[in-house]
Amino acid sequence: MINLLDFNKTGLIHFCEEMGEKPYRARQLLRWVHRFGKTEFIEMSDLAKTFRQKLMERAVVHPPEIISDHTAGDGTRKWLLSTGTGNAVEMVFIPEPNRGTLCVSSQVGCALACSFCSTGRQGFNRNLSVAEIIGQLWWANRLLEGQVGELFSPDVAQIRADNTDTRRPVTNVVMMGMGEPLANFENVVTALDLMLSDDAYGLSRRRVTVSTSGLVPALDRLRERCPVALAVSLHAPNDALRDQLVPINKKYPIRDLLAACERYLPAAPRDFITFEYVMLRDVNDSIALARELVQVVRNIPCKLNLIPFNTFAGSGYERSNTDAIDNFRDVLMQAGIVTTVRKTRGDDIAAACGQLAGQVKDKTRRTGTCGSGRAVVTG
């Protein structure tokens, strides 16, 4: 059976034509599946009965199975999604007064082996399918539906409640979950196309961000195919240190990466690149390195996002103390570089940045099923 979640509009047009249907049927399917979240063809009332029968014989709408659901004290919510054979990936929803951000995974594990990342320690299993990527957004909108009044400030909630197109709680998507998005290029781009489609999720390119550790050729392809907002995991101002923290730097050093960023900017929906910099105590948080970083990025329109490290067992790293982070930020700000310190969210449920390990083989053997049919961890 063909999973319709694997298709963007172009793919659905081809699928419909193969069944002898007109191209406009693809738009109808997109709206039923993604905007209205329907999985049963019998409910798609504006489709001809003969077409619905064909669909029931050949296709399914099958999002990945949810195996656990956790909510942190700050409202951050994390779900584990089964990918079969005891593996799982994670998606995280971060509510804020004026927006709701979904952090999406693109791979089971990651091959890039960044030394400070728990997912990198897991190793690489496989790429996620389009259905498994877009299924995260599909699920989030379904599971959070009706909670707009609780998730947003009163004025924003009222505006969104009055507009059918903005009732969905996810306003922003960041490809910052498990995996390197650009290492799963085709599936990620197809999923991005669905996120941006007015017939599916209708997000603007400014509200969708792809984060990369620096796969330069794929970054150039993204610029040509689907230039959404870009975040680059930099983490060091020189190759010697970045080689240790982000091993892909040995293949695509900082000079090549920054050149790719400059090429990306003319097509980007924002007039800057975001550079991410995890703050590791006594590793990359000195004033000298801050000054070196200023020299490295000063000619690129950018923002710096300093990320306090979230420790995990066996990491070998510690979070920089508050004074070190503040002093590092001040050096950048004094040089005219817009710099923010990321607020740690969801760390009490291991949902914070860098903690998405997804090692749940023991949990998948201990799942039960709730009344809605979704599996939940029982122990």
UniProtKB/Swiss-Prot annotation:
It catalyses: adenosine(2503) in 23S rRNA + 2 reduced [2Fe-2S]-[ferredoxin] + 2 S-adenosyl-L-methionine = 2-methyladenosine(2503) in 23S rRNA + 5'-deoxyadenosine + L-methionine + 2 oxidized [2Fe-2S]-[ferredoxin] + S-adenosyl-L-homocysteine; adenosine(37) in tRNA + 2 reduced [2Fe-2S]-[ferredoxin] + 2 S-adenosyl-L-methionine = 2-methyladenosine(37) in tRNA + 5'-deoxyadenosine + L-methionine + 2 oxidized [2Fe-2S]-[ferredoxin] + S-adenosyl-L-homocysteine. The active site is at residues 90, 353. GO terms for molecular function: 4 iron, 4 sulfur cluster binding; metal ion binding; rRNA (adenine(2503)-C2-)-methyltransferase activity; rRNA binding; tRNA (adenine(37)-C2)-methyltransferase activity; tRNA binding. S-adenosyl-L-methionine binds at residues 179-180, 211, 233-235, 310. GO terms for biological process: rRNA base methylation; tRNA methylation. It comes from the Bacteria. Reaction proceeds by a ping-pong mechanism involving intermediate methylation of a conserved cysteine residue. Specifically methylates position 2 of adenine 2503 in 23S rRNA and position 2 of adenine 37 in tRNAs. m2A2503 modification seems to play a crucial role in the proofreading step occurring at the peptidyl transferase center and thus would serve to optimize ribosomal fidelity. This is Dual-specificity RNA methyltransferase RlmN. It comes from Nitrosomonas eutropha (strain DSM 101675 / C91 / Nm57). The lineage of its organism: Bacteria, Pseudomonadati, Pseudomonadota, Betaproteobacteria, Nitrosomonadales. The gene is rlmN.
